């Protein structure tokens, strides 16, 4: 469920 947010968070890291 938080996979999409995790990807965006990681990409913005």
UniProtKB/Swiss-Prot annotation:
Q: Which cysteines are joined by disulfide bonds?
A: none
- Do you know what upregulates this one? By phenol.
The cofactor remark states: Binds 1 FMN per monomer.
Q: Which cofactor is recorded for it?
A: FMN
**Highest taxon, organism lineage:** Bacteria
Q: Is Transmembrane among the key words of this record?
A: no
- Could you list this entry's UniProt keywords, alphabetically sorted: Flavoprotein, FMN
Family (UniProt): Belongs to the WrbA family.
Identification of the protein by name? Flavoprotein WrbA 1
* Species the sequence originates in: Acinetobacter calcoaceticus
């Amino acid at each position: 469920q938080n996979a999409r947010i995790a990807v965006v968070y990681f990409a913005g890291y």
